[in-house]
Amino acid sequence: MRSTNSTTRTRRAVRAAAVVAAGALALSLTACGGGDDDKKTGSDESSKASGGGAETGSTVTLPKLDGTTLEVAAVWTGAEQANFKKVLAEFSRRTGAKVTFVPAQDPIINFLGSKIAGGQPPDVALLPQPGAIKQAVEKKWAKPVGAEAQAQLSKNYSQGWQDIGKVDGKQYGVYYKAANKSLIWYNAKALENAGASEPKTWKDLLSTAQQVYDSGVTPFSVGGADGWTLTDWFENVYLSQAGPEKYDQLAQHKIKWTDPSVKQALTTLAQIWSKKDYLAGGPDGALQTEFPASVTQTFTGGDQPKAAMVYEGDFAQVNIGETKAKVGTDAKVFPFPAVGASAPVVSGGDAAVILKDSKAAQALVTFLASPDAATIQAKLGGYLSPNKNVPESAYPNEVQRTIAKALIASGDDFRFDMSDQAPQAFGGTPGKGEWKDLQDFLKNPSDVAGTQAKLEKDAAAAYGGGS
């Protein structure tokens, strides 16, 4: 599922990108932008856009749009929002259009529904789930991208990243932002003191956890208050263990959650989740810990943090940046270990979708599909683009360059976050569906069969029937 920072998906599997953060993913994280004047996103601000403007260069021709106005909605906040506004400012500088950023709330489909019902839909929205794109199409809100945007997609994106933005073979989404959700971040000093090394396999991870525990530090921090973190844990184990074909089938509910492959994945997860002393605060504490705190508590307290390791995507760097820890020295990362034959790499992302068709809206999604837009935000940090023509040098540190290189190298060989492909009622609603069922499982990891039954019941209701 998406993160509170970004946010997280195609029909092909990620095996090749297991090298995602191999070796010492080093160097300190460059700060992600600063205070941006929320009231000004027009051309007068664009000359101040760090990393933007003329230095980025131009690879796409945009029309003159003087006198036009556009509204762009997304759930992004903080530095992520401020940095995206700099991208919008560059679009304004080059076209003359006045662009306003509209802060949205999760779930964004509900937010957009209220705006549309009130007769005030934004021109473009950034949607964090393929399921949301499908819903927007089914509700007849979304408009297909035009020839110019399609040309940029064909030139700059792998077929897999194009396909995940399609509904019934028609292109509606332009994936502007990606996430690598197969990473485990760790407190370097805590592992060093325990004499532990970066694990390559699940068995190695269990050994590392025991070494850390024996040294007097709790092994894992889990942000269980946000159910999407638990779906991400499950998806990585399931993809590596059951394989891409089964992953696709479960994502589409073509096999049931009572399938033996789900039992195997839950049983594997229980090897960690059932050990109360392995989780910061135990299961109850984990269920009260939101994602941002699960990261920051891993990197505060020096070599005696509340936990030594925290699982989540590349976007965790933003939260690490809120501590005194430096990425690459105090905070390091390794790929999610192989549970089966190969290590998983699960991806996520946010797609731009047109809600009010116009020359200006089409020009904006064309710009967002170009390297020009992504390069601006890449330079600012805390961002990953699926655009293969964004230069690696645009990323501000070696950690992000390595992750970006692995994402692009995987081409079409990757899998999109499973819960983000599901109907919102099952895969994207706090306190319901998969989020709630896995929270209950974290509380009682011995009840594998009961968890499977609840997951299947909720999935069947959300997908509109059994498999």
What are these regions (language model features)?
Residues 28-31:
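C-terminal motif of bacterial Sec signal peptides marking the signal peptidase cleavage site
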